[in-house]
Amino acid sequence: EYNNAKGVECYERLKGKAAKSAGPIHTMSTGISYALIDKSAQDKLPLAMMGYGRTDAVDGSVFPYAFPLVTTYQMQASAIVKFIKDKNGGNLAGKKIVYLYHDSAYGKEAIIAMEAEASLNKFQLVQIPVAHPGNEQGAQWLKIRQEKPDYVVFWGWGVMNQTALKAAQKVGYPRDKMIGSWWTGSEEDVVPAGDAAKGYMAATWNVAGKDVPVIADIEKVVYGAGKGNLQDKSKIGTILYNRGVSAAVLSVEAIRKGQEKYGKGKALNGEQTRWALENLDITDARLKAIGATNLLPQIKTSCDNHEGSGKVKIQQWDGAKWVPVSDWIEGNKALIHPLFQASAKQYAKEKGITPRDCSKEK
């Protein structure tokens, strides 16, 4: 259920505990993040928005307590365009790309990036919204059939995802020309679509599978000892399971970083956790040390970059599993980050916020 009010209610219940011992609060929703941005800053409790929005919170000078870590919708969209461009000999001029999106804050976040990429790369962009929940897409796919796009970039959520894949099959649109966001790229999105999903691609900021050492260790040490609480153990190693482990990695690494500064074993408050999130430096060497090699990309945050990476991989569903078909791809930072900064500057103006001087932050 996509319900922002319940997310705010959950935050209000938790914030008393969080103020005393605050790890980052994972909202798991762009809409909930928007609802909590101002409130969490007032409460001095950091929000972790891994892979989602509000995307202009990359600018920590304006949003000190909001962290769209790893990547954002706009950088993800840019990386998808780069992947398509590389598939077409580095030239998208004259191509047509449909942006099919969930008509919500989530779906709308990437529009500005797609428009910027279309202007830069000279391709035609066709925007097609889908009303929530997305289980009716007949009109949208009729339009796609009429438009005959070279690619469909897909920003779906929930039942919208399997519906789109089945609709694409029905109108004869090739699924290997569809590339979705990470909210459209889990096993739960493709398995219900059956054969209609085969060949479909999606971006991801974490890999699937059990060949990541920490995932294999969890299965062996935790579930092997009968201590796990996951009823369906086949979920271990899936995209969403590994994403949860990725969130745990970043949360624990933030606490470790904070304790390096404020005292080993110390329960951090919100301000101290905020500092830690803003000073993350998770290198490949560190990922290897904790058994998370290739689980997610390197992360290095700062006052003016609360994202820390901007990279995704593209994966393809082969009918049984997700298979990576790219290395880590970084979106066009030179194109996209000024969009964040302009949006953050406008937000600061509207809210009467004086941005921090990042040159003075350490």
Question: Can you annotate each of these PLM segments?
Answer:
Residues 1-4:
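Acidic helix-start/capping segments at beta-turn-to-alpha-helix junctions
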Residues 6, 12, 16, 55-56, ...:
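Extracellular/periplasmic Venus flytrap/periplasmic-binding protein
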Residues 12-26, 31-49, 59-67, 146, ...:
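Extracytoplasmic "Venus flytrap"/periplasmic binding protein-like
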Residues 12-20, 37-45, 85-90, 115-123, ...:
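Sec-exported extracytoplasmic/periplasmic mature domains
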Residues 47-49, 53-58, 133, 174-193, ...:
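Venus flytrap/periplasmic-binding-protein-like
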Residues 168-248, 343:
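Extracellular/periplasmic periplasmic-binding protein-like sensory domains
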Residues 229-241, 252-327, 331:
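Segments of small-molecule ligand-sensing domains
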